[in-house]
Amino acid sequence: MQPDLFSTASQADANATPEEPDASNPAARAAWLRDELNRHNYSYHVLDNPSIPDAEYDKLFRELQALETSHPELLVFDSPTQRVGALALSAFPQVTHSVPMLSLGNGFEDEDIIAFDKRVSDGLNSTEIEYATELKFDGLAINLRYEDGILVEAATRGDGATGENVTTNIRTVRAIPLRLHTATPPKVLDVRGEVMMYKADLAKLNARQRDAGGKEFANPRNAAAGSLRQLDSRITAQRTLRFFAYGIGMLEGAEMPPSHSALLDWYAELGLPVCAERAVVKGAAGLLEFYKAVGQKRPTLPYEIDGVVYKVNRVEQQQQLGFVSRAPRYAIAHKFPAEEALTTVQGIEVQVGRTGAITPVARLAPVLVGGVTVTNATLHNEDEVRRKDIQIGDTVIVRRAGDVIPEVVAYVPEKRPVDAQPFVMPTNCPVCNSPIVKLEDEAIARCSGGWVKCAAQRKGGLLHFVSRRAMDVEGLGDQLVEQLVDKHIITTAADLYKLGFRALAELDRMADKSAQNVMAALEKSKSTTLARFIYALGIRHVGEATAKELARHFGNLEALLQASEEQLLEVADIGPVVAQSIRSFLSDPLNMELIEQLQAAGVRWPEHVVENKPKPFAGKTFVLTGTLPTLSRDQAAEKIEAAGGKVAGSVSKKTSYVVAGADAGSKLAKAEELGITILDESALLQLLDTHE
């Protein structure tokens, strides 16, 4: 028998049916109705096992609504009646995740998974690793924050660091408990999971949309995302969204379960929906067996998945492996082969990117691939077109690589028409007519016009400049930038800060309010960081991580501007190609003029001078654990990095020192086991003072 998760009574009492109070006691009657409706909600939306007919549920629901209307003092925040939606929002506020929502690395072939298992085994110095395996849902990643057991906030993944607050809409998802089913909830619990729409629910939604003359959704993921991002939560409430929990962010006031499988079992006890399609296996053989079994079952599943996920099961081992870049070393997504379809190439055009890259693009007869209608597909570069021998008129195999980016895989020889036309790379840019050039050691051809002559490069460069990870100018999208460039209102990024209110308000699809918002966003963007500014400049080969390293190494813009190629090569992870690209960009008078104009416009950031003195911790790796008496972890890390040291997230044989504070956990034990030098805060500060 299914335990009663809604009662705070003992397990022995959990299965008892509470006595039904009559209407003479409204408070008791309302409490009983809430319990009954929550119980039936859980059976229907989480267990997928309806316990009463819909008509009986509706009868109880209407009775509770009537009671709460006549006795407003009985209304509580987590009443089932409060899931119907609230008044529309004007926008979704931003939420900074306490623990970043990281992405996973991908594997596509068996060899990728075997290699992953070997990396894990080597990293743990162990064989036959125990893994937790689960499905990779094709929905929208969400973080649910519970405080003292109550749902207080829900946010989308966003860029991993910052998402959108969709709490009002999430409250309408009946599968998600508004209160955890426990008498002893954690102080803070961040539940990570996926919001999705079942295939059958999508079919019903599209039927309603057709009848109402509304927009139909191509696939369940689009429907889930579109429904969750409705500013009017009453619309969200009308759409059947589901949720599965699969991960954790912040946890305070409770002990972390020892394994991922134990975490999911705990979630189920708390009343959170957890997918039953999961297992604990050992080694690469167990992973591949799970993948094969799920692949065979995939067509019969009620929801869309695009792969499976493998995670090292033991939390202690996860912590030992740590992270690389923006992904954990202890987990990987094993993607299913991308869906493919046949269509014809109606033409091949070239697109010009922000760095002048010329990319051939196949214009295709519309075809449905993986639930999405595809009309264009990348051909990457001229050499790739030649290698695959793609011609206009060909019947081709189109694949959504990684189920996202459409690409042409190959042509079908027996279907090639006699009048098929080979692709001819133009000699001049289709946008500005500048010569197209191609260096001997590069596969990509480029427009030589630069952003001064080429409108396509200007548009691409400006869109990059205002993007979220660069200057983060909200409201400046493709259509607006296109108008500004095409109407010759702006030429460079510096011109953005010279824009007047009237010039913006008179553009198509703009009004006074929108123009005011863009003006405010531009003003706000002037206060930035050196790393963001460097990244926003769009220097070829300089991504986010490289921009951060440059800012950290040089400390201020002037030092970077004066740096030689040799000095640039001293920066972590910068090689000759990147150093030459940076030096070439900074040697161009037009680029230097742009930087000066941006600073004159008021773009600013905090700078610090990097002192040219020995780095005593160079080559040393530190791990921080526990709570230090006076320094936060960030402050301790800054001091270590300023002295040339590296701060890692996990302990290994390569660790030089472990800095331990109060409540140090498994990292301290691991350090003692490996014989690594352990420092407290005072010893760390003394070590730093010794070298000053």
Swiss-Prot record:
Coiled coil: none annotated. Keywords: DNA damage, DNA repair, DNA replication, Ligase, Magnesium, Manganese, Metal-binding, NAD, Zinc. The keyword Ligase applies. Residues 1-27 are annotated as: Disordered. It comes from the Bacteria. It is an enzyme of class 6 (ligase). Its EC number is 6.5.1.2. Residues 1-14 have a biased composition (Polar residues). Residues 612-692 form the BRCT domain. One of its GO terms (cellular component) is cytosol. It catalyses: NAD(+) + (deoxyribonucleotide)n-3'-hydroxyl + 5'-phospho-(deoxyribonucleotide)m = (deoxyribonucleotide)n+m + AMP + beta-nicotinamide D-nucleotide. SUPFAM superfamilies: BRCT domain (SSF52113), DNA ligase/mRNA capping enzyme, catalytic domain (SSF56091), Nucleic acid-binding proteins (SSF50249), RuvA domain 2-like (SSF47781). Pfam families: BRCT, DNA_ligase_aden, DNA_ligase_OB, DNA_ligase_ZBD, HHH_2, Nlig-Ia. InterPro entries: BRCT_dom, BRCT_dom_sf, DisA/LigA_HHH, DNA_ligase, DNA_ligase_AS, DNA_ligase_CS, DNAligase_adenylation, DNAligase_N. The active site is at 136 (n6-amp-lysine intermediate). Zn(2+) binds at residues 429, 432, 447, 454. NAD(+) binds at residues 54-58, 103-104, 134, 157, 194, 311, 335. GO terms for biological process: DNA repair; DNA replication. PANTHER family: CHROMOSOME TRANSMISSION FIDELITY FACTOR 18 (PTHR23389), DNA LIGASE (PTHR23389:SF9). Belongs to the NAD-dependent DNA ligase family. LigA subfamily. This is DNA ligase. It comes from Janthinobacterium sp. (strain Marseille) (Minibacterium massiliensis).
